[in-house]
Amino acid sequence: VSQLGYMVLAVAAGGALGYAGGMLHLINHVFFKDLLFLICGAVMFATHRDSLDDLGGIGRKMPFTLCMFAIAGLSVVGVPPTSGFSSKWLIYHALTQAGQPFLALLSLVGSVLTLAYIAKFLHAAFLGQPAPDLDDVHEAPKIIRVPMGILAAGCVLTGVFPGLALLPINGVLGEYGLEPLNVGLSGVLSGPGAWNATGMF
């Protein structure tokens, strides 16, 4: 639900930056939230548990799932070079440009709080001491892991190359009478909200 709030804020900010940020976050949300759901499913399938209190230490048994969770977690928090950063960056700038720096600050605080619950899940499920009756846990089958890998690739690709999503979005902005952003494969190239995702590293 919290991620939907970013989209609403982006639309409320208005302008090309706001609408582009909101639509980009919608796309990114599909990648990282669906990946998180699949990770939960993989953990439940492998452990036959549905409570965090009954887990612990399964990262040693499920390293692929742990890696997928790291990508999804960084993306939902908005850490570069994942996709969540690219859309949240635009939303922060859209709010500032709309004269709402306080809302931009609150949005940033929201990302910090998101980090808290991601860290809680990470520690409760994957880190710590493994439960003694989880010794036979192993990775989920390929039918679960392959979609996880595809979604994780989307989280990274739209983070490193946000133009993959922004270029089509830019076309939509023009259809609604908004001035398109100066967008390239690596991000917004000039003006408010400009950043070069590939140049950051």
Place the predicted regions along the sequence by residue:
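Predominantly late transmembrane helices and immediately cytosolic-facing juxtamembrane segments
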Residues: 33-37, 98-139
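Interfacial segments of multi-pass membrane proteins
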Residues: 8-17, 87-105
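Glycine- and aromatic-enriched alpha-helical transmembrane segments of multi-pass membrane proteins
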Residues: 145-166, 190-201
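Alpha-helical transmembrane segments and their membrane-interface junctions
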Residues: 73-90, 152-174
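Membrane-interfacial helical/loop segments at transmembrane boundaries in membrane proteins
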Residues: 94, 164-195
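Membrane-interfacial loop-to-helix junctions in multi-pass transporters
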Residues: 16, 58-68, 98-102, 142-144
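Alpha-helical multi-pass transmembrane bundles of energy-transducing inner-membrane proteins
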Residues: 2-52
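Hydrophobic alpha-helical transmembrane segments
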Residues: 104-111, 185-201
